Structures are given as structure tokens and as C-alpha cells.
Amino acid sequence: MSVWAIGDLQGCYDITQRLLEKINFDPAQDTLWFCGDLVNRGGQSLETLRLVHSLRAHSVVVLGNHDLSLLAIGARSEEEQRKVNPDLLRIVLAEDRDALLDWLRMQKLAHVDRALGWMMIHAGLAPKWTTQMAEKHAREVEQQLQGGGYRKLLRNMYGDQPGWSPGLIGYDRSRAIINLFTRMRYCTPRGRIATDDKGTPGTQAQGLYPWFEVPGRVERDLKIVCGHWSALGLTITQGVHAIDTGAVWGGKLTALQLDTDELRVVQVPGREVTGPAPVARAPRRPRERLGRQRSRGNRGNAGNTAVPAKPQVDTPQD
């Protein structure tokens, strides 16, 4: 039995299939951990969502910002839904949309396997959160998403504020938790997220740190695997294993085997990108735009590679 974590799919169905073939995925005995952002940008979001849904008995999914955006779109009126990009529109108009979206809404913000020694999230954790605290806060939002009032949560999750504070209540608290789990890259030592900084470490504004390198952060008792930050490439440092290697931007799609003493990395080439990368959008209201986010992903060979002794950090695609 093998356990594989897989980076952001972002609607790249054909590439996902190639990666599953390359790792010789056997649903009878293997398990897949998907790091979130199953959909958007890749042009095959419906096919990708159907594929992961079909593997639901053999996989674990954590929600990314694009997955939450899809859920919010699905909860809107038909008139509003028709204004979204064609890739996501195909999902909300599909005959099996209810089955797909209801299943997606039941997925986690954080997955923990203490026997295996791993936690999976999409983006990041607050500097002072232990893994136990992260689980607790994830469950708070998951219960809302899975309950009858989920539409109100999806309407109220947008925005950059407030920053995390243990005393937050209501939708402010839920929004802060969602932002940490699904949008985090850089933050201050107090855990304030910087949403405008998306490049490689060293390009951020003064006073900001990658969330996994913040001074004074707590020691965590589990290894962490995550996606979201494609500009990093394959990065393994401080007990964090970032595996979004920019498949949708022309990089690679990465699988990381979690159940071996020596971590094994398998990659396949990502989507061919011939024109400018589309504008990246976080889960905000449609009128708000974010800056461009591009990456070549990991520049290493697209095969089975050992984890580098020194973290490999890639630069964004120009």
C-alpha cells in the first residue's frame, strides 16, 4: 500500500491521469491525498472533479481557495452563475453538478493521519497554531460548510480582514480561518496575512516571512504537506513539504509518497502554456482582482527523484 500526496490539479485532467499512471496507482491498495485547488484555469475542471469524485473511496481531499470559490458560485443564482469563466460554468451546468458540489462541500480544510505522521493543508497555518489547534479550527469551518447554513458562510467568506485572533467570533472568525488554510503565503510574526505578496522568498515586503519560517512559530509534531504556492516550486524545509509545482502554468504536477522513510517524488510535465497566464483570482467577490501569479514549477527532471537535501526554490515565470 502506498500513500501519495498530489499537488494542485487546477483542472488539468489529462496531466492528472498521466501522473496516476506514472505512480502505478492501484485503487485496491493505494491512497491519494489531494492538496486542494482541484479546479479552475486548466480547462478540464469538470473532468478533473469527476475523476477525483470517482476516487473518493480511495482518496482524501482538502479544500483550496479555488474549490471554495466553486462552491460559492454553485450557491448563487443561475443568472450570476452564467457570468463565471467557462471552465467553472461547465461544472455548475453539468447534470451531475449537485452530486459533485455536495461531495466537494463535505471535504476538509485539514487532514491529519497521526499514525502516518502527516498533516495535509492547502496553503498555511497561523504561526502559533499547533497541529491540534489547527485541527480544531478546521473543524469549526467544516461543520459550517457541511451544515444547513453553508450558503451564508460562502457569501461571507470573502475579504482579507480581519487577521486571526483567538477572540474572533461569527463570520469574521470563519473568514480568518479560511484565509489561513487556503490563501496563506507570507505573514507577519503576529500571523497577519499579506495577500499581495506571491513571489519567491526574498521578494516580499519588509517584515513579512514565509508562513513556515516565521520567527517564534510553534514546533509542530507532524510533517506538513501543502500546495497553493506555485512560485516556490518543490520546497522541503522546516518540516513543510510544498508540492504545488505549477502544472497549470507549464511547470510540473508532483506526487510525493508519504509512507516511506525516504520521501519519493514523481513528476510529469504540466500544461503547455502558449500565451500569457490568466489572472489569478483568490476567493473574492468577482469585481476584485488579484495580481498575476505564474510559475515554471520545479525545473528538475520529470521523473522519479529523491528529495533534495537543500530545498529547491524556483522563480516565477516571466
UniProtKB/Swiss-Prot annotation:
Pfam families: Metallophos. It catalyses: P(1),P(4)-bis(5'-adenosyl) tetraphosphate + H2O = 2 ADP + 2 H(+). It is an enzyme of class 3 (hydrolase). InterPro entries: ApaH, Calcineurin-like_PHP_ApaH, Metallo-depent_PP-like, Ser/Thr-sp_prot-phosphatase. SUPFAM superfamilies: Metallo-dependent phosphatases. GO terms for molecular function: bis(5'-nucleosyl)-tetraphosphatase (symmetrical) activity. Its EC number is 3.6.1.41. Keywords: Hydrolase. Residues 269-318 are annotated as: Disordered. Residues 282-297 have a biased composition (Basic residues). Belongs to the Ap4A hydrolase family. Hydrolyzes diadenosine 5',5'''-P1,P4-tetraphosphate to yield ADP. This is Bis(5'-nucleosyl)-tetraphosphatase, symmetrical. It comes from Xanthomonas oryzae pv. oryzae (strain KACC10331 / KXO85). The lineage of its organism: Bacteria, Pseudomonadati, Pseudomonadota, Gammaproteobacteria, Lysobacterales.
